[in-house]
UniProtKB/Swiss-Prot annotation:
InterPro entries, A to Z: B3_DNA-bd, B3_domain, DNA-bd_pseudobarrel_sf
GO molecular function: DNA binding
Primary residence: nucleus
UniProt keywords, alphabetically: DNA-binding, Nucleus, Repeat, Transcription, Transcription regulation
Record has Transmembrane as a keyword: no
Origin species: Arabidopsis thaliana (Mouse-ear cress)
Protein name (record): Putative B3 domain-containing protein At1g78640
PANTHER family on file: B3 DOMAIN PROTEIN, TRANSCRIPTION FACTOR B3-DOMAIN FAMILY-RELATED
DNA-binding region: 171-269, 379-474
GO annotations of cellular component type: nucleus
Location in or out of the cell: Nucleus
Record lineage: Eukaryota, Viridiplantae, Streptophyta, Embryophyta, Tracheophyta
Length: 487
């Protein structure tokens, strides 16, 4: 039987840059007088010959679907003819085009790819399915896939807000160890030097609950407490906007580049838009020990903040996980009216964990005392055992002798951790150990202390200072005297 061979002209070649999932060949025609004859037609694609029976070309359109397969490193040189369409590149799919020829001839190789023969795998089927999804579904499907592959990251800095963190002082006080281990070490050397000299460094703070970015200043009080703080926007952008209160628990982590997974620079794709960030959101409110790294991929030199209510409820917008953003725009309303409050967990294990964290935080305060009436009116009386165990053993022998009964005592520097201020008191022994000569003025009146309030003290050996903090107040409302204090 006579056979006819011909090459498909250039205008009939298949373009792999098309965004369509199926490309018909409409210009292949067979002479009507030879329809009954059995003919063989071959296609030449990138130097590879594919034989096809003419019967498979009798229909008006020959459908040639394009699906995605993983790239073959060994045959990467053969993929230079292939180009992903712009839409696929934006989605960041790490795949190459796959072409399959439909036909009834069992000898036809239907697994011809630009990289050579490759059997269909479970991944190919999954990518093929994703090609047929809408843009919104692809983002959701991709987000789900990435979420399962990403390693967990922790909220490395957690803090239960104190009164001084939310009042007029307009700063968030950080634990020195946390700040140095989880923030300072990741900053450029120049910024570290500035901070150690007392110069503030501008940072971007991403609110993980409201998907908003804010400016703050990270600095250190080098002349007084040596403490690290965030200010320059903390009060307005977080305390006021989020209505943070004393007792709220917040989480922080620094999203450094080395922590990112599939970073945008590595993938060569554009930054995540707001909807994608919403799709992949994993809130501190839902799980204080986990973050989803899509956030890190976008904010690679910033730190992120999430908040959680301890007193019964926590604030969050929107609900965690994958959410429907069809009714949202890129400019999201983050007003407090749109905040959703949901009950906190009732899981006994989580409750016990939170209580344990609070206990660990209070272990810094080796001396704790509930103020008596005389403490609020005259001087602070401390138990003999607590002073001898946690203060005297850290003093020089000559200083310890000055505290003996009948001696005037010694002057000690007392750093108020809540207000970031330093004061001087006299530690003496009068039937019991006391702090006097300024206690009533600089602490009771300035801080508005009352009978029943719980305070904490601990001695810092490296600076030879006594640290002070109000751990609990009988009346939670901030006193007027403290509100008027200048920062």
């Amino acid at each position: 039987m006579a056979e006819e061979q011909r090459e498909i002209s250039h205008e009939n070649n298949v373009s792999l840059g098309s965004a369509e999932t199926a490309i018909p060949l409409t210009n292949v025609s067979i002479s009507p007088t030879k329809k009954e004859e059995q003919k063989t037609v071959y296609l030449v694609l990138f130097g590879r010959t594919i034989y096809v029976e003419s019967s498979s070309l009798e229909s008006e359109e020959t459908v040639m679907p394009i699906v995605d397969v993983p790239k073959s490193p060994a045959k990467e040189d053969l993929t230079t003819h292939c180009s992903l369409d712009a839409e696929s590149s934006e989605k960041g799919f790490p795949v190459d085009p796959y072409m399959g020829i439909l036909g009834n001839n069992p000898n036809i190789n239907s697994n011809v790819t630009c990289a050579g023969n490759k059997d269909l795998t479970e991944d190919i089927i999954k990518f093929k399915k994703m090609r047929s999804l809408s843009k919104e579904k692809i983002v959701e499907e991709k987000g789900t896939r990435v979420l399962t592959e990403l390693p967990p990251y922790t909220w490395t800095i957690k803090k239960t807000l104190k009164e001084s963190d939310i009042n007029h002082q307009c700063r968030l006080l950080l634990n020195t160890t946390d700040a140095e281990n989880h923030i300072m070490r990741h900053l450029p050397t120049d910024d570290q030097k500035k901070i150690q000299e007392g110069i503030g460094v501008d940072v971007k703070a991403y609110d993980h609950d409201t998907y908003t970015e804010h400016d703050m200043v990270f600095k250190r009080h080098v002349k007084t407490s040596k403490s690290y703080v965030f200010n320059g926007g903390w009060a307005k952008a977080f305390v006021g906007r989020r209505e943070l209160k004393e007792g709220d628990k917040i989480g922080l982590f620094w999203a450094k580049k080395s922590q990112t997974f599939m970073s945008q620079e590595q993938q060569g794709t554009s930054p995540l838009n707001t909807d994608e960030a919403l799709k992949s959101h994993h809130s501190f409110s839902q799980n204080p020990n986990y973050i989803e790294s899509n956030l890190s991929r976008r904010y690679q030199t910033n730190f992120s903040l999430g908040s959680q209510r301890i007193s019964g409820q926590f604030l969050m917008i929107p609900n965690p996980g994958f959410v429907d953003t069809s009714s949202m725009t890129n400019t999201h309303d983050t007003s407090l009216a749109n905040f959703q409050t949901v009950p906190t967990t009732t899981n006994p294990k989580i409750i016990l964990k939170e209580e344990k964290e609070n206990e660990e935080e209070q272990q810094y305060w080796t001396i704790k005392k509930e103020l008596t009436k005389s403490d609020a009116c005259q001087r602070l009386t401390l138990s003999k055992s607590s002073v001898e165990e946690h203060i005297l053993k850290h003093l020089l022998p000559e200083d310890s002798q000055k505290i003996d009964k009948g001696k005037p005592g010694i002057t000690v520097k007392v750093y108020d951790n809540d207000t970031d201020t330093e004061h001087e008191l006299c530690l003496a022994f009068q039937c019991s150990y006391v702090l006097k000569n300024g206690w009533v003025k600089t602490f009771v009146k300035r801080r508005g202390l009352e009978e029943g309030d719980m305070i904490g003290l601990f001695w810092e050996c490296s600076t030879s200072k006594l640290h002070f903090s109000v751990l609990f107040r009988v009346n939670a409302k901030a006193p007027a005297a403290e509100e008027k204090e200048a920062y």
